[in-house]
Amino acid sequence: MSLRHMSRRASRFGVVAVASIGLAAAAQSVAFAAPAFSVSPASGLSDGQSVSVSVSGAAAGETYYIAQCAPVGGQDACNPATATSFTTDASGAASFSFVVRKSYAGSTPEGTPVGSVDCATDACNLGAGNSGLDLGHVALTFG
């Protein structure tokens, strides 16, 4: 599912869940440096832990969305309880905390319930972007 498609349906989800996109990043001009998206720590996590998210090289003053998701039954199952938006500063950077969950009731970006997600067995990730740019995805592992 493309990020552009997901953003059109964001009103039902509350924010765009950016799970397994990448088309927007692939379509970017080669003249622009790719943005950097990092999560620390990303492994050995525990339920309810706060992780530090850092973004650089993105567009200045843009709103992006971030969500914890996992592929479940061929669909993206995101956590609507923690999905949120953030805005980059004048240099295209942002730093903030995000609470990760080991398990949650997953929903598609359209808001359709998908079922339970258990990040101990499902391949969970934290992804960020908007309809014009995929900032990236970081795999999450729980200890």
UniProtKB/Swiss-Prot annotation:
One of its GO terms (biological process) is defense response to bacterium. It comes from the Bacteria. Residues 1-33 form the signal peptide. Disulfide bonds join C69-C78, C119-C124. GO terms for molecular function: DNA binding. Keywords: Antibiotic, Antimicrobial, Disulfide bond, DNA-binding, Signal. InterPro entries: Neocarzinostatin-like, Neocarzinostatin_fam. Binds non-covalently to a chromophore which is the cytotoxic and mutagenic component of the antibiotic. The chromophore binds to DNA as a weak intercalator and causes single- and double-strand breaks. Belongs to the neocarzinostatin family. This is Actinoxanthin. The lineage of its organism: Bacteria, Bacillati, Actinomycetota, Actinomycetes, Kitasatosporales.
